[in-house]
Amino acid sequence: MFFTCGPNEAMVVSGFCRSPPVMVAGGRVFVLPCIQQIQRISLNTLTLNVKSEKVYTRHGVPISVTGIAQVKIQGQNKEMLAAACQMFLGKTEAEIAHIALETLEGHQRAIMAHMTVEEIYKDRQKFSEQVFKVASSDLVNMGISVVSYTLKDIHDDQDYLHSLGKARTAQVQKDARIGEAEAKRDAGIREAKAKQEKVSAQYLSEIEMAKAQRDYELKKAAYDIEVNTRRAQADLAYQLQVAKTKQQIEEQRVQVQVVERAQQVAVQEQEIARREKELEARVRKPAEAERYKLERLAEAEKSQLIMQAEAEAEAVRMRGEAEAFAIGARARAEAEQMAKKAEAFQLYQEAAQLDMLLEKLPQVAEEISGPLTSANKITLVSSGSGAMGAAKVTGEVLDILSRLPESVERLTGVSISQVNHKPLRTA
């Protein structure tokens, strides 16, 4: 089963499988009942009132000292906790406090025996540090740490400390009387010095005031001279500036007249230029504009006629080629139909083909020239060389017809010229 303890307590588990014993400060531990044993030890801080009655000091004067010490078993240090468990396990807090108290009192007595009453009385910090240092080194071996030690009280039964106080009081009173007399003396001296310094300061002040008055009058006279000089210079400068200003005004007036005259000349020149531009705009520019307009109109009309003629010629050419293609298609159809005729004309072979082509050529020529018969107007554009007029039209038509055998050859694969020049074969 589990056992727990707070941070101010430690548990020691011994017995089966617990060698050495397990020590747990502020936690929990598992204990097997009956075969393992658990014991607890307190880690609380203990306050000890350490009294040493009638202890003889180094000079043999018996005094009594009371100190306050705070001690506790150190649970964070495993070695000190183990030492404390070995010495105090199973003991109560009172028993542990008694052991620590006896140890501290012994060390306190030892320190008192090595110091005088005056040292203990006047330097309590030194006494406390020595007791703390010596007692700590001894109690550490028991697992106890000294948290703090403070000297609380010192007294004796022989009025030794009281006598020390009386002597000190008398000395203080003596020093006070001496100090009072010296203070009165010093006060008188300082008062006399103060009066002397006051008179000296008054005289010095009057001297300084006289010097200041003299310096003021001298500076005022110099200032008046400078002011009058500056005033005269200012008057002369003003008159000179007035003369310069009048001269500048006259120069500016002359310059204004020159500028006005120059502006009049510029205005006249601008008027002349304006009249010239007006004349040019009224006479020259309209003539040039009209000439330019006529030139542009002529060029536009020329371009329009050229483009119109090219468009019409292209239209005629494309219609002719389209109709020729249609005729060629019909010719191929008829050629297939005439294949049987060709078998009947085995004796004539090429002659039969030539006969059929020649039979259809008038129809082809008629279809090609047909669009020309429906044209209302033919516009011819000449580049300056070649035929003109009707001869030009005739030449164009003949040119189209001259390309007819070539077109037939591309469409049918039969060359009219070659067939015409071959001799007829008989069966």
UniProtKB/Swiss-Prot annotation:
Pfam families, per database record:
Band_7, Flot
Q: Which UniProt keywords apply?
A: Cell membrane, Endosome, Membrane, Phosphoprotein
Q: How does it sit in the membrane?
A: Peripheral membrane protein
Q: List the disulfide bonds.
A: none
- Please state where this protein is localized: Cell membrane; Endosome; Membrane, Caveola; Melanosome
Q: Which GO terms describe its molecular function?
A: protease binding
- Coiled coil regions in record: none
Phosphoserine found at? 19, 163, 385
- Kindly list the GO CC terms recorded for this protein: adherens junction; basolateral plasma membrane; cell-cell contact zone; centriolar satellite; COP9 signalosome; cortical actin cytoskeleton; cytoplasmic vesicle; dopaminergic synapse
| InterPro entries, A to Z | Band_7 (IPR001107), Band_7/SPFH_dom_sf (IPR036013), Flotillin_C (IPR031905), Flotillin_fam (IPR027705)
GO biological process terms on file: axonogenesis; cellular response to exogenous dsRNA; dsRNA transport; extracellular matrix disassembly; intracellular signal transduction; plasma membrane raft assembly; positive regulation of canonical NF-kappaB signal transduction; positive regulation of cell junction assembly
Q: Which family does it belong to?
A: Belongs to the band 7/mec-2 family. Flotillin subfamily.
Cite the PANTHER family for this sequence. FLOTILLIN-1-RELATED, FLOTILLIN-RELATED
Record note on quaternary structure:
Heterooligomeric complex of flotillin-1 and flotillin-2 and caveolin-1 and caveolin-2. Interacts with ECPAS.
Described function: May act as a scaffolding protein within caveolar membranes, functionally participating in formation of caveolae or caveolae-like vesicles.
What is the name listed in the Swiss-Prot or TrEMBL entry for this protein?
Answer: Flotillin-1
- Species source reads Bos taurus (Bovine)
